């Protein structure tokens, strides 16, 4: 069956990854050590998308955990689901990348990468029909950004025809974890544009906003944020893991979502999001899910789609949902918000339906949008990059690891190109071709 091999790199990637495995294990009825004690055959039916069956009714995630320092992995191992993972699949160095992209991509990470690729190869050989890879990482640090992108390109070399999806935590507009974040992020985007098939952009600030505004948590922890991300990650692959009336998988998603190969950076959202106290006061219906999932406040990346237009979207519904109702709602959304959808891709919302809802909910929906407004995010990082790079601030950390300034310049211009490509398609309209045609004809009228 269509297996997915999961990689998590760096501190952020490992923490999101751990939350994801917790969510997935719950959905499939596994306890913290991978033993099945679920209630329904449906949970077992396609368990092998993410899990290998070992002896004694134990299931082992197809996950590879990577970091350049042992700290985060020790925490994962000590956590509630630490006994789930195969011990050989923890690959870590001792030195750390110290938020330095060059260390992750060229020096420290490069020493460790072959070891990781061996583990990935072994996982891939254990699959009947490997569908692709998913990787969780952040773009602002050293290991997740530098080594994460190195891994992506190595895996790309070895498995050129398999899907590569990344869940990438992009730098937030106002909150920055490290000063050199703009450098690391720009160098990473430079890699992702070329080597990833679909990148789901998530940022902490947007997640904080959702936690505070919608979930009414007064001081959200990273645990709360990661829980949100894991809900989306689970939603994206739900069709692979449970039966549904309208299936979707990583490849179908990419075919429907990526009109031009470089423009594969998606915004994601999840519904229903309600504060813990308000659960019992709301009935969740398809119109309400649709309303909420197209709400800018629900997007997990800090760019407002009202400033751009959707090239394509995908909506994945879970639970007992009527197909007709979903189609009506989608048509409704499209006709009401015509200005936010490009008119030169006529039916640009893809829907998928899966009959099994997530734990504790009657129905839910996952939203994935390819909006031109994501350029705001790249523009913001690009501006910060330019400000520092003009003065060559902090560059010695990177050149000291053997990087060339040229590479910075290339990454910068690649990101600027990406921004202007998004802008170009945002401004494009159906009638452009026709207008030129009319201009040629006009002079004839005046001669009469």
Curated annotation (Swiss-Prot):
Q: Which GO terms describe its biological process?
A: microtubule-based process
Q: Which family does it belong to?
A: Belongs to the tubulin family.
For molecular function, the Gene Ontology terms on record are:
GTP binding; GTPase activity; metal ion binding; structural constituent of cytoskeleton
InterPro entries given in the database record? Beta-tubulin_BS, Beta_tubulin, Tub_FtsZ_C, Tubulin, Tubulin/FtsZ-like_C, Tubulin/FtsZ_2-layer-sand-dom, Tubulin/FtsZ_GTPase_sf, Tubulin_C
What is this protein's name? Tubulin beta chain
Matching entries from CDD domains are given as: beta_tubulin
Residues engaged in binding Mg(2+):
69
Keywords, alphabetical? Cytoplasm, Cytoskeleton, GTP-binding, Magnesium, Metal-binding, Microtubule, Nucleotide-binding
Which region ranges are annotated with the description Disordered? 425-448
- Coiled coil regions, renumbered to chain: none
Q: What is its main location?
A: cytoplasm
SMART domains of this UniProt entry? Tubulin (SM00864), Tubulin_C (SM00865)
For this chain, the annotated S-S bridges are none
Q: Which Pfam families match?
A: Tubulin, Tubulin_C
Q: Check the record and name the PROSITE patterns matching this protein.
A: TUBULIN (PS00227), TUBULIN_B_AUTOREG (PS00228)
* Protein role: Tubulin is the major constituent of microtubules, a cylinder consisting of laterally associated linear protofilaments composed of alpha- and beta-tubulin heterodimers. Microtubules grow by the addition of GTP-tubulin dimers to the microtubule end, where a stabilizing cap forms. Below the cap, tubulin dimers are in GDP-bound state, owing to GTPase activity of alpha-tubulin.
Domain of life, source organism: Eukaryota
- Where along the chain is GTP bound? 11, 69, 138, 142-144, 204, 226
Listed cofactors: Mg(2+)
Quaternary structure and partners: Dimer of alpha and beta chains. A typical microtubule is a hollow water-filled tube with an outer diameter of 25 nm and an inner diameter of 15 nM. Alpha-beta heterodimers associate head-to-tail to form protofilaments running lengthwise along the microtubule wall with the beta-tubulin subunit facing the microtubule plus end conferring a structural polarity. Microtubules usually have 13 protofilaments but different protofilament numbers can be found in some organisms and specialized cells.
Extent of Acidic residues compositional bias? 432-448
Q: Name one GO cellular component term.
A: cytoplasm
- UniProt subcellular location: Cytoplasm, Cytoskeleton
């Amino acid at each position: 069956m269509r297996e997915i091999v999961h990689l998590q790199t760096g501190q952020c990637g490992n923490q999101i990854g751990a939350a994801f495995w917790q969510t997935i294990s719950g959905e499939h009825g596994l306890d913290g050590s991978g033993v099945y004690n679920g209630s329904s055959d449906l949970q077992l039916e396609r368990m092998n998308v993410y899990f290998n069956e070992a002896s004694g009714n134990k299931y082992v995630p197809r996950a590879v955990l990577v970091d350049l320092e042992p700290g985060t992995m020790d925490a994962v191992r000590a956590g509630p689901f630490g006994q789930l993972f195969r011990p050989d699949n923890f690959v870590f160095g001792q030195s750390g990348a110290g938020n330095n992209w060059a260390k992750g991509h060229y020096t420290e990470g490069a020493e460790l990468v072959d070891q990781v690729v061996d583990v990935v190869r072994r996982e891939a050989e254990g699959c009947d029909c490997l569908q692709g890879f998913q990787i969780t990482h952040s773009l602002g640090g050293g290991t997740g950004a530098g080594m994460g992108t190195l891994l992506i390109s190595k895996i790309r070399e070895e498995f050129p025809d398999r899907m590569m999806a990344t869940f990438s935590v992009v730098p937030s507009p106002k909150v920055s974890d490290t000063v050199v974040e703009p450098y690391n992020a720009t160098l990473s985007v430079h890699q992702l544009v070329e080597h990833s098939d679909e990148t789901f952009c998530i940022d902490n600030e947007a997640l904080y906003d959702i936690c505070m505004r919608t979930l009414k948590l007064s001081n959200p922890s990273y645990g709360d944020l990661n829980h949100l991300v894991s809900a989306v990650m689970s939603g994206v692959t739900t069709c692979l893991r449970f039966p549904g009336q309208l299936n979707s998988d990583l490849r179908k998603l990419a075919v429907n979502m990526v009109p031009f190969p470089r423009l594969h950076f998606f915004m994601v959202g999840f519904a229903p999001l309600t504060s813990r106290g308000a659960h019992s006061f709301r009935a969740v219906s398809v119109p309400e899910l649709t309303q909420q999932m197209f709400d800018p406040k629900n997007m997990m990346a800090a760019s407002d789609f009202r400033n751009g237009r959707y090239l394509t979207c995908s909506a994945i519904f879970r639970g007992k949902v009527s197909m007709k109702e979903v189609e009506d709602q989608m048509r409704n959304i499209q006709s009401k918000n015509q200005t936010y959808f490009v008119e030169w891709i006529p039916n640009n919302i893809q829907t998928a339906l899966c009959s099994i809802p997530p734990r504790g909910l009657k129905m839910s929906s996952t939203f994935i949008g390819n909006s031109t407004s994501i350029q705001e995010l790249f523009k913001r990082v690009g501006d910060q990059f330019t400000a520092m790079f003009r003065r060559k601030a902090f560059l010695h950390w990177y050149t000291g690891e053997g990087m060339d300034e040229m590479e910075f310049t290339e990454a910068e211009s690649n990101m600027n190109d990406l921004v202007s490509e998004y802008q170009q398609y945002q401004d494009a309209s159906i009638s452009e071709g026709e207008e030129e045609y009319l201009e040629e004809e006009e002079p004839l009228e005046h001669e009469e």
